[in-house]
């Protein structure tokens, strides 16, 4: 835990203590400042609400504000404060007189109880109510999990009652999900126990944030688009290898009903009472890593500046933000911010985790090429970029200056940010520079590859241009499957790479800015409803496991019933 503002007088507060002490405004007042009438806010208590679909539809002809992406370098396991910086930047923009909204993802229970913690920011740059957001919030993840598992149940039920669609039980592509890290459920055998329980088959669970239903909710433009996409989900194949869709077993309507309310964005506020949309939550290492299109496009109609994040490093989240979300939603980003920390750069320079707090300018300079590659990669999309140095108390002036000097050699600028400890006052400089950059009109956004490029070449484009790999390794089965999907009319879809977040390569231990490595493809999955091809590389898992000492061991209720240990 880093020391907080006020440490000189011995005042040390945890994230949850800071959040609990926040002076929140009634959510109706937050909405009123955005021009949302109370009848179009569906309240969940006094501090959170959903925005009605009717209000959202009425905003479509309005002019868009500026769109700013916050991404990061390859992180340490604890993360580098990307959400914290996203929230802090919006507070900073509002502090300097700009009308800004933050758009971030909802938290998954997996990392909350695992190693990474929640997704509400930290220190004095948080969205609140932090406890609700990090736990059950408005029930969106429950709805997504329920809709996904309804389809799973309907598949087995369809087979049990005669299998009218002639589904080949060896080729069922749809698994089950739960919002928890549980390695024991990765591969299981279901329907054991006799004839009454159905046909035994191998299956498994993924984490909810890897669900195609999550991706669909985050990419759908409205409820009708949502239902259409749900119907397009491929649940498996027949013996002649023709696909079976969710609509073929009449699952799409009921799934859409379960997701009707979840489709509406959630409005909350920052510690400084600025508006925040928190909606959707796909991971960026095993999914596309962006908040919902509906939340982002709505925010763009209501504010002059919208700041959103994309998960993990720019090799994952930012690439998918540009190549999937912006491509599919017609978004045009105006600027990007790459969050870097001294500790993450030193880790990329070879410093061990236990030594990250010690000054080591030489190792930092050795790790800077990791930051440099992320800067160059973002610029490949035609988007101008700034670097935010998220300050830790262990950082030294020499280390901070070394980062600034390095970034300057690449034609960009790095700005020291202390929003974690000081709130908006600690990020004013970055806010000024980001607003100027976004307003300058320098962005010439273009995706990395065209729609018409063959699928395998799209994979190679990402691997070679973004990861700097020398080769993509895929066996005949993978290549043949990609060609079959092209023949079936799916060749125009973008690629969603599932890869470790800790390295440009598929080896989490290969730090820095490696070149000449290979990218082995283990599996490919067609997410026809979401509208992309998932390419699973290396040892990445779509159902994570818990660490040896999970965060859950520190989470409890105190004697008065208040939560302790959540971060």
Curated annotation (Swiss-Prot):
Keywords: ATP-binding, Ligase, Nucleotide-binding, One-carbon metabolism. It comes from the Bacteria. The keyword Nucleotide-binding applies. It catalyses: (6S)-5,6,7,8-tetrahydrofolate + formate + ATP = (6R)-10-formyltetrahydrofolate + ADP + phosphate. Pathway: One-carbon metabolism; tetrahydrofolate interconversion. One of its GO terms (molecular function) is ATP binding. ATP binds at residues 76-83. Its EC number is 6.3.4.3. SUPFAM superfamilies: P-loop containing nucleoside triphosphate hydrolases. Pfam families: FTHFS. One of its GO terms (biological process) is tetrahydrofolate interconversion. InterPro entries: Formate_THF_ligase, Formate_THF_ligase_CS, P-loop_NTPase. Belongs to the formate--tetrahydrofolate ligase family. HAMAP family: FTHFS. This is Formate--tetrahydrofolate ligase.
């Amino acid at each position: 835990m880093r020391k907080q503002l006020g440490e000189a007088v011995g005042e040390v507060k945890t994230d949850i203590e800071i959040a609990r002490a926040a002076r929140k405004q009634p959510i109706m007042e937050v909405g009123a400042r955005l021009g949302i009438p109370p009848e179009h806010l569906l309240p969940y208590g006094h501090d959170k609400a959903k925005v009605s679909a009717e209000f959202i539809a009425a905003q479509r002809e309005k002019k868009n504000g500026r769109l700013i992406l916050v991404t990061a370098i390859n992180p340490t396991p604890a993360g580098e404060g990307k959400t914290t910086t996203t929230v802090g930047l919006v507070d900073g923009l509002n502090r300097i007189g700009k009308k800004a909204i933050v758009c971030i993802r909802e938290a998954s229970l997996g990392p909350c109880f695992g190693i990474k913690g929640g997704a509400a920011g930290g220190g004095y740059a948080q969205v609140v109510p932090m406890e609700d957001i990090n736990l059950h919030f408005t029930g969106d993840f429950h709805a997504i999990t329920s809709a996904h598992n309804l389809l799973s149940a309907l598949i087995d039920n369809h087979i049990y009652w005669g299998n009218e669609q002639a589904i080949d039980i060896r080729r069922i592509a749809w698994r089950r999900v739960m919002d928890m890290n549980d390695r024991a459920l990765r591969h299981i055998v279901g329907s054991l126990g006799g004839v009454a329980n159905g046909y035994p088959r191998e299956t498994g669970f993924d984490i909810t944030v890897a669900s195609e239903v999550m991706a669909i909710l985050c990419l759908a433009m409205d409820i009708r688009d949502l239902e259409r996409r749900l119907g397009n989900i491929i649940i498996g194949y027949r013996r002649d290898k023709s696909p079976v869709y969710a609509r073929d077993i009449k699952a799409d309507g009921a799934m859409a009903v379960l997701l009707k309310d979840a489709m509406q964005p959630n409005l909350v506020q920052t510690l400084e009472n600025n508006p925040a949309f928190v909606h959707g939550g796909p991971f960026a290492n095993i999914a596309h890593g962006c908040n919902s299109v509906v939340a982002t496009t709505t925010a763009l109609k209501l504010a002059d500046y919208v700041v959103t994040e994309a998960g993990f490093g720019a090799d994952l989240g930012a690439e998918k933000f540009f190549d999937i979300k912006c491509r599919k939603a017609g978004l045009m980003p105006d600027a990007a911010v790459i969050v870097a920390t001294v500790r993450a750069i030193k880790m990329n320079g070879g410093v061990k985790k236990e030594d990250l707090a010690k000054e080591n300018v030489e190792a930092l300079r050795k790790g800077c090429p990791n930051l440099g590659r992320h800067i160059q990669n973002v610029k490949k999309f035609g988007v101008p970029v700034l670097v935010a140095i998220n300050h830790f108390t262990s950082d030294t002036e020499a280390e901070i200056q070394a980062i600034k000097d390095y970034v300057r050699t690449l034609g960009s600028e790095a700005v020291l940010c202390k929003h974690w400890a000081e709130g908006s006052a600690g990020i004013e400089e970055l806010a000024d520079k980001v607003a100027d950059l976004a307003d300058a009109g320098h962005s010439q956004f273009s995706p990395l590859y065209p729609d018409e490029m063959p699928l395998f070449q799209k994979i190679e484009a990402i691997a070679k241009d973004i990861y700097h790999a020398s080769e993509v390794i895929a066996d005949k089965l993978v290549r043949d499957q990609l060609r079959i999907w092209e023949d079936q009319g799916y060749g125009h879809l973008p690629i969603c790479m599932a890869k470790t977040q800790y390295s440009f390569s598929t080896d989490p231990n290969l730090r820095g800015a490696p070149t000449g490595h290979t990218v082995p493809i283990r599996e490919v999955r067609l997410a026809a409803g979401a509208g992309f091809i998932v390419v699973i590389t290396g040892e990445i898992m779509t159902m994570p496991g818990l660490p040896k000492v999970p965060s859950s061991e520190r989470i409890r209720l105190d004697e008065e019933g208040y939560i302790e240990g959540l971060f």
